[in-house]
C-alpha cells in the first residue's frame, strides 16, 4: 500500500495508482488517454470528498499523526519571513522537540514557538518524537517572557503526543516545568494565539497552549490522553482505541461545540499533507485576522479576556 495513504483511503490509493499507470503510457501517441485520466481524477475527487465527509474520530486521530503531515518548521517556512531560531533554556540544555524564535508575520514581529517531530529516524530520535523534556518547556517560557519584554505577540503551534515521561525528565521536574508555563502564560501582557496542527497531547500540549485564541486544524486532535491510553485504562486493551476516541470528543468540531476551540481551520481535501502550502495559507490568514483583533485590547482587557476564557471551560 502507498505509505501516503491510510487504510481507509485504500479506494483513493487504487484510483491514484490507475492514474499513474495511464500517465506512464501517456507518451504513446497512438493512445488518447487524456479523457480517461480526467475522468479518473474527477472520480478520485468525488471519492475523497465522500470518504472525508464521514470520518470517524479514530480516523481523524490517525490523520493527525500522518507521517507526511506538515510540522511546525514546515509552517514557519510557508507563513513567516526572517525566522531566527533561538536555542536553550539557560538552565540545562537545548531541547530539539521545541523550536522557537523571532520572525515576521507580514510586517509584524512575532515570537513563534512549536513542537517539532522528525521525518527520518535520526531526526525523530533527536527531536524525541515531538515529546519535550523540561528544558524544552523552559526554553519556551524564556522565549515567551522575551516576547512580552519586547512587546511581540506569541504564536504557538501544538503537535505532540505528550510531554516526555522518561525518568530523566522526571528528575528535572517535568510537572513543575509544565505548571510554571501555565502560570506564566496566563499572566503575559501580550497576545497569544495557539494553533493545534496535529496531535494535542495532554499537558505536553497545554504547556504552550494557554492563549487568547485557540485554533485547531480540521484533522487535528486535542485530548488529555491518547485514545490508546484511554482504552488501555478503561477496557484493558488498546484495541478499543476507536471507541475511546469517539467517547473522548477529541476532534476539532467536537471541541468547537464545547466552546474550548475558537476556530476550526479547514484543510485541503485529503488533509494538510496533500497541499501544505494551501494549509499554511489558511493558517496565515487566520493568524493575521486574529492578531489584528487582539491588538485592539489594552493589557488589562487582554488579561481579563484570557482569564474569563479559561474560567469558562467546563461550564
Swiss-Prot record:
Subcellular location: Cytoplasm
A cellular component term, taken from the record's GO annotations: acetyl-CoA carboxylase complex
Any Pfam family hit: ACCA
Disulfide bonds: none
NCBIfam families membership: accA, AccA_sub, PRK05724.1
HAMAP family xrefs: AcetylCoA_CT_alpha
Name recorded for this polypeptide: Acetyl-coenzyme A carboxylase carboxyl transferase subunit alpha
Source species of the chain: Pseudomonas fluorescens (strain Pf0-1)
Amino acid at each position: 500500500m502507498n505509505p501516503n495513504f491510510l487504510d481507509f483511503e485504500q479506494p483513493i490509493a487504487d484510483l491514484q495508482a490507475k492514474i499513474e499507470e495511464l500517465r506512464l503510457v501517456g507518451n504513446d501517441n497512438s493512445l488518447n488517454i487524456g479523457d480517461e485520466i480526467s475522468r479518473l481524477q474527477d472520480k478520485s475527487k468525488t471519492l475523497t470528498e465522500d470518504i472525508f465527509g464521514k470520518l470517524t474520530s479514530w480516523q481523524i486521530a490517525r490523520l493527525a499523526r500522518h507521517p507526511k503531515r506538515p510540522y511546525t518548521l514546515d509552517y514557519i517556512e510557508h507563513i513567516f519571513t526572517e525566522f531566527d531560531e533561538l536555542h536553550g533554556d539557560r538552565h540545562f540544555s537545548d531541547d530539539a522537540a521545541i523550536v522557537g524564535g523571532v520572525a515576521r508575520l507580514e510586517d509584524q514581529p512575532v515570537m513563534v514557538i512549536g513542537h517539532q517531530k522528525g521525518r527520518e529516524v535520526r531526526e525523530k530520535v533527536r527531536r524525541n518524537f515531538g515529546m519535550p523534556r523540561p528544558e524544552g518547556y523552559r526554553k519556551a517560557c524564556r522565549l515567551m517572557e522575551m516576547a512580552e519584554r519586547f512587546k511581540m505577540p506569541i504564536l504557538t503551534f501544538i503537535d505532540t503526543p505528550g510531554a516526555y515521561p522518561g525518568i530523566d525528565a522526571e528528575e528535572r521536574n517535568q510537572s513543575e516545568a509544565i505548571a510554571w508555563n501555565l502560570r506564566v502564560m496566563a499572566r503575559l501582557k501580550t497576545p497569544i494565539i495557539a494553533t493545534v496542527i496535529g496531535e494535542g497531547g495532554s499537558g505536553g500540549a497545554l504547556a504552550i497552549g494557554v492563549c487568547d485564541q485557540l485554533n485547531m486544524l480540521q484533522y487535528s486532535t486535542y485530548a488529555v490522553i491518547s485514545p490508546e491510553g484511554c482504552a488501555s485504562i478503561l477496557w484493558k486493551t488498546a484495541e478499543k482505541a476507536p471507541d475511546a476516541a469517539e467517547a473522548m470528543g477529541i476532534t476539532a468540531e467536537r471541541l468547537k461545540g464545547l466552546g474550548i476551540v475558537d476556530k476550526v481551520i479547514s484543510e485541503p481535501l485529503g488533509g494538510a499533507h496533500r497541499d501544505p502550502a494551501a494549509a499554511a495559507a489558511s493558517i496565515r490568514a487566520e493568524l493575521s485576522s486574529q492578531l489584528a483583533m487582539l491588538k485592539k485590547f489594552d493589557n488589562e482587557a487582554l488579561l481579563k479576556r484570557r482569564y474569563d476564557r479559561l474560567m469558562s471551560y467546563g461550564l
